[in-house]
């Protein structure tokens, strides 16, 4: 059953805390993308549910920084002024902070693209339908949840979670997009690469 847009939940990665971090003072917490860039001087590390989660989150942040500062360079070029990208990075390094008004301007421009459940959900394809299969449980989405028949060395219990928070879903989505292994994938309606139902 599809929900209307007004019924759909909202979870925007720019504003909602979802990135687990360890702080310089030894505390832990979750921050939004906007907070992450605001508090860079007080954040020691990104700390995912598993260590491998940090890399895709960091990669997303790096893409945001690259795009934001590329817009600065494009603006200079539009006015026939040359700007050295190394000088831009040197400014950031010396200030020990990012240009928050610049980042906030970028976040405002792309805000709708970072909603986990919006009409164009973050890093997802709208309208995919499984060809002949029920949905997999959420545990299939989580890398360190073992299948019951293969449970041996795991830090988790045999009981697979039935639900996860929106923050966890965002982290595991990035993880899956970065590290999902090859193999048999559930066929979706319209996929022309399906052979023998796989």
For the regions a protein language model found, what residue spans apply to each?
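Conserved small-residue
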Residues: 1-156, 160-198
